Amino acid sequence: MKKIILATSNKNKIIEFKKILSELNINTISQKDLGICSIEENKSTFLENALIKARNASKYGFPALSDDSGLIIKTLNGEPGVYSSRFSGNQSNDIKNINMVLKKMLPFKKMDRQACMHCVLIYIRNPNDPIPIISSGTIYGKISNSISKINFGFGYDSIFFLPKKKKTISELTLEEKIKISHRGIAMKKMIKFLKNEKY
């Protein structure tokens, strides 16, 4: 059975990855289980950050799959973007980050609240792999005025409103979320690559 390191320490992302990859004959191992420390995400794009995370994890003898994703808000000129997980500072967490977004969006309560969530996935066979497999996914919605009382998600899910669904991402079940989310879209593309990979 093929082994892949999941280059993330985010337990919620690991749950989603394992759920989506369950259809493949792949043994997924989180980097935490191997004692791999997270690497600093100091690049300016999701692609670059995903690449350094994948290269770091793949040093430990197995191919690695990494994710870098975030929230992009039109009226905030793309914020929080690559800083999504640490938008509220060094001691950030989901609640602090959400409150920071809602605070910054207060002046735009009746204006354009369009946003998107974007995910970049990279599969790398070894640290020197010159042809990593890359996939991405984007979902569009709006920033709600308050936090949803129903929260099955994580990150910014509880304030990311989906007009077609008339609910936030956090109100979806895991199965529903995987079908339409930015990460789910990127993973479906990645699975096609992994199924047909010959190198």
From Swiss-Prot:
Binding residue positions for Mg(2+): 40, 68
Binding site for substrate: 8-13, 69, 154-157, 177, 182-183
UniProt keyword annotations, A-Z: Hydrolase, Magnesium, Metal-binding, Nucleotide metabolism, Nucleotide-binding
Names of required cofactors: Mg(2+)
Active site per the UniProt annotation: 68
Reaction catalysis annotation: XTP + H2O = XMP + diphosphate + H(+); dITP + H2O = dIMP + diphosphate + H(+); ITP + H2O = IMP + diphosphate + H(+)
Biological processes per GO annotation: nucleotide metabolic process; purine nucleoside triphosphate catabolic process
EC number(s) recorded for this UniProt protein: 3.6.1.66
GO cellular component, one term: cytosol
MF terms (GO), sorted A to Z: dITP diphosphatase activity; ITP diphosphatase activity; metal ion binding; nucleotide binding; ribonucleoside triphosphate phosphatase activity; XTP diphosphatase activity
Cofactor: how and how many bound: Binds 1 Mg(2+) ion per subunit.
Family matches, as HAMAP family: Non_canon_purine_NTPase (MF_01405)
Subunit: Homodimer.
Protein family: Belongs to the HAM1 NTPase family.
Summary of the function given for this chain in its UniProt record: Pyrophosphatase that catalyzes the hydrolysis of nucleoside triphosphates to their monophosphate derivatives, with a high preference for the non-canonical purine nucleotides XTP (xanthosine triphosphate), dITP (deoxyinosine triphosphate) and ITP. Seems to function as a house-cleaning enzyme that removes non-canonical purine nucleotides from the nucleotide pool, thus preventing their incorporation into DNA/RNA and avoiding chromosomal lesions.
Name recorded for this polypeptide: dITP/XTP pyrophosphatase
